[in-house]
């Protein structure tokens, strides 16, 4: 099955950063247009009360989308590995921002 993976980005005590908000909005539009489930990924730093994945999922609670929060990982590699190992993801559209697109593509390719 193909998924839409939303990579984590900063959140501030439960409020999404501009970058995370943009990723989630784009993912929701894409997933709805292509009838795909969404996986939000991203853990939390020491002292944080909320995970990046949890904040992203909460943004989508009112949408009629199939959303899973995988509250693990602190970087692109660990987030993609968690999606593969915990949820069996082998095919996905990965939502990130333009500055991270090439690096994300290379990491995804390396990790299978």
What are these model-predicted stretches?
Residues 1-112:
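A structural signal for short, hydrophobic/glycine-enriched beta-strand patches
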